[in-house]
Amino acid sequence: MGRSISVSFGLLVVFLSLSGIGADFDCPSGWSAYDQHCYQAVDEPKSWADAEKFCTEQANGGHLVSIDSKKEANFVAELVSQNIKETRRTDFVWIGLRAEDKRQHCSSEWSDGSSINYQNWIEAESKKCLGLEKQTRYRKWVNLNCGQPYRFTCEI
């Protein structure tokens, strides 16, 4: 009877591991997991377009981070705070959102194509790309000049 229970328990563990239930989400080395996604704070300043390109080249499905909830915003803020070195250029960090038309209206979707379900603007300006501001502990979104080099966070 005891051996039968051990075999049954072993099969249950294998089944749960294969189905992904109860297993940790597996991210590439150097990436952090949160809610079935992987994130990487990149401490190398780039323009918005170059940062987006860098993220797409890191992994299949990679893009600048899209923030869908306050919980995810808090996770990203902590990740950035812990992984971006303090310099004069750490006032802002790119996220995957920018204005797509001449009237400076923001796109209705993130750079990864997902819908905007959560917003946390600090102010509206005429610049086209969005980032997180250090002064708000990387929790508020601010409009920035797309060509300026800032650090950024990728998501897959």
Swiss-Prot record:
Expressed by the venom gland. This is Snaclec A10. Shows greater sequence similarity to the alpha than beta subunits compared to other heterodimer snaclecs. Interferes with one step of hemostasis (modulation of platelet aggregation, or coagulation cascade, for example). It is found in: Secreted. Residues 34-155 form the C-type lectin domain. Gene3D superfamilies: Mannose-Binding Protein A, subunit A. Belongs to the snaclec family. Disulfide bonds join C27-C38, C55-C154, C129-C146. Heterodimer; disulfide-linked. It comes from Macrovipera lebetinus (Levantine viper). Residues 1-23 form the signal peptide. GO terms for molecular function: toxin activity. GO terms for cellular component: extracellular region. InterPro entries: C-type_lectin-like, C-type_lectin-like/link_sf, C-type_lectin/snaclec_domain, C-type_lectin_CS, CTDL_fold. Keywords: Disulfide bond, Hemostasis impairing toxin, Secreted, Signal, Toxin.
